[in-house]
């Protein structure tokens, strides 16, 4: 079924998991609040509404995580210095305890979006030491990008997925430029990180406090110190942003430098061409597969009422709360056990 859904998406024909639901007139329950409160959305035969709907179950997060995992696994296999979700980069700029609380919350909730509004800290998806071309910061730059690579340095990366039917695909840039939807989304990442850093600075380091003596706060300074945050964006049709392509190329170069003799290639450049082609195929298959799986998972919620969706969401929240309580109880048990441990010098050791 995954293959059939992926092919239907690529060819622009009716989606196998949405076609029958659309013929039966089934709907997706509308939100409880807002301008569209109580207004159900009819399922379309192509599955666009199913793909972009915000539903319980965390399917969009699963799609994001599986895609990101494959990309960073490629980087690690190639020998690039890769750190996933580096939570200590901003630790020194945050008050004591705030970063630890953010990390604990992310672990308990299975959250991979630490930079989202309302979170306690800034947690990028990865920090990778790499040499890449200058980041694209405008639509014009995307048309004729600079391909000269900058010196090796640690960069921050954030993975995003763009689903069919969202505003990114309806924009003028998406209609005008090939890959415009993912490029535009990638260029939004830097601004989102800086806004979130500024928000945290306002909370923890208001202007005038000892640590906020510069035009920008200490948390935003950390973001700026890492150059521009790179957006690794994957689209609904298997396309990806320039930074994904450049990262795959850099991984292939690193692997070719290390393995070209072992591969039996006459030169490093021949090994590079083989490796980069395999990385592109591998990444493309995973990106398309996860988009198809996302649509299949989402289709399970078609026809349910808003009350049923709310009940599912509340049950998942209760399960998360129970996991959090269990973690706290386990930590407390360790503390109690440690209090009864007799030091070695008292045991005569």
State where each predicted segment sits:
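Gly/Pro/Ser/Thr-rich low-complexity, intrinsically disordered segments predominantly at protein N-termini
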Residues: 42, 70-73, 80
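Domain-level cores of phosphate- or acyl-group-handling catalytic modules
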Residues: 82-84, 127-128
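Non-catalytic C-terminal interaction segments of nucleic acid-processing enzymes
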Residues: 1-36, 56-59, 72-73, 77, ...
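Long, charged, glycine-rich C-terminal linkers/tails
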Residues: 84-90
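Short Cys/His-based metal-binding microdomains
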Residues: 31-67
């Amino acid at each position: 079924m995954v293959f059939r859904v992926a092919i239907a998406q690529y060819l622009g024909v009716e989606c196998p998991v949405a076609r029958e639901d659309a013929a039966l007139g089934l709907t997706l329950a509308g939100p409880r609040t807002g301008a569209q409160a109580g207004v159900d959305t009819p399922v379309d035969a192509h599955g666009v509404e199913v793909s972009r709907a915000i539903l319980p179950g965390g399917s969009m997060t699963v799609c994001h995580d599986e895609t990101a995992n494959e990309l960073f696994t490629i980087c690690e296999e190639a020998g690039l210095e890769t750190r996933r979700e580096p939570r200590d980069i901003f630790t020194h700029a945050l008050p004591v305890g705030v970063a630890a609380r953010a990390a604990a919350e992310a672990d308990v909730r299975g959250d991979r979006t630490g930079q989202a509004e309302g979170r306690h800290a800034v947690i990028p998806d990865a920090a990778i030491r790499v040499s890449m071309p200058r980041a694209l910061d405008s639509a014009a730059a995307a048309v004729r990008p600079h391909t000269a690579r900058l010196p090796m340095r640690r960069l921050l990366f954030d993975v995003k997925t763009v689903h069919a039917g969202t505003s990114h695909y309806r924009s003028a840039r998406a209609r005008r430029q090939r890959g415009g939807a993912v490029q535009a989304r990638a260029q939004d990442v830097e601004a989102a990180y800086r806004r979130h850093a500024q928000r945290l600075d306002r909370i923890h380091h208001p202007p005038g406090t000892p640590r906020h003596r510069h035009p920008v706060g200490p948390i935003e300074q950390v973001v700026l110190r890492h150059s521009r945050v790179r957006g690794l964006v994957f689209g609904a049709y298997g396309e990806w942003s320039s930074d994904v392509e450049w990262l795959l190329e850099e991984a292939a170069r690193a692997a070719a430098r290390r393995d070209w003799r072992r591969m039996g290639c006459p030169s490093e450049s021949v090994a590079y061409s083989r490796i980069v082609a395999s990385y592109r195929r591998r990444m493309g298959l995973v990106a398309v597969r996860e988009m198809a799986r996302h649509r299949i998972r989402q289709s399970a919620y078609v026809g349910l009422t808003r009350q049923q969706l709310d009940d599912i969401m509340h049950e998942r929240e209760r399960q998360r709360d129970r996991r959090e309580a269990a973690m706290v109880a386990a930590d407390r048990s360790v503390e109690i056990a440690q209090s009864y441990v007799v030091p070695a010098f008292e045991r005569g050791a």
